Amino acid sequence: MKKSDFYYDLPPELIAQTPLERRDASRLLTLDKRTGATEHHVFHELPDFLNEGDCLVMNDSRVIPARLFGTRPTGGSVEVVLLRDLGGGDWECLTRPGRKTQPGTHISFGNGELTAEVIRAEADGNKVLHFNYDGIFLELLDKLGKMPLPPYIKEELTDKERYQTVYSRDPGSAAAP
């Protein structure tokens, strides 16, 4: 299988920039396993396609404002996206620019109320950062962080709650499903 097998044209005007007011009006693509035919529907029609014994899996993870903008001691800017909580204040992260965030690099966020040190680089290019702070980490993220929107979403997010799934409860996702 080649990566090019997954390339396709997607006109920009078909990419929703904001969530629909009525979530059950979102589009639903169905596949008939017997014929291979696909059909377009709307989400509120989902019960029409379910059968007794079908299993639905609900994603109840809340997206955290995992995108942080900080500065290095040199004054250079750093973007950090939290990917995975490793415990003890350590997080696996994406950093930009990656070359400028080598182990030992210190980063300050906000007015210094949240700081981090790059403690190691992973083979895949991700970095492990150790965060230092007083208080509750998720509260600092709510104050300092932004939702990590995908690059094809160009509009600024105005309501963090609209980016959550309707089932969201437990904080931890770095992006919406």
Feature-to-residue mapping (PLM):
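A cross-family signal for N-terminal binding/gating loops and helix N-caps
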Residues: M1-P177
